[in-house]
Amino acid sequence: MISEKVKNQIQVVQGDITKLDCDGIVNAANRSLLGGGGVDGAIHRAAGPELLAECRMLHGCRTGEAKITKGYRLKAKYIIHTVGPIYSGTAEDAAQLADCYRNSLNLAKEHDVHSIAFPAISTGVYGYPLEDATEIAVKTVAQWLEAHAYYAMQVIFCCFDARTERVYQARL
């Protein structure tokens, strides 16, 4: 059960994550961090070529980890890049997906980010079932917010379509 205090810190919206006005957005990246399809490609296109140049200097990212760059041409000051698991149905997938959210939030806090937007990590071409991924996302974020109650953080789950938005809303 999610407390009312935590529920008030979480928002679900349908839209384009690259257009959100918040301190940081999370990029569901691939291991190279050099751009790709889906939200990753959209973020790279919107942020501009400077993002790719900075990402090259990061030398990739392991699954479940997170790295941070400037937001460049986005409204967001920062982009936090995390690599979700390619779904295979194992417990390791769930642990790595939870790590994506937890490590992104920890990195955001280290950089004084107080509002952060997440896409539905791993639910596109990486094949993670939406309902399962949403449960992990909401549970992990809620646990982090409870554990860091002293830190003012607003979390936005930015959904690509109406179905995803409905699934997230149902979990809150």
Regions found by a protein language model. Name each.
Residues M1-A94, A98-E110:
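Glycine-/small-residue-enriched capping loops at alpha/beta junctions
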Residues Y87-L172:
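Phosphate/ribose-phosphate-bearing ligand recognition and processing surfaces
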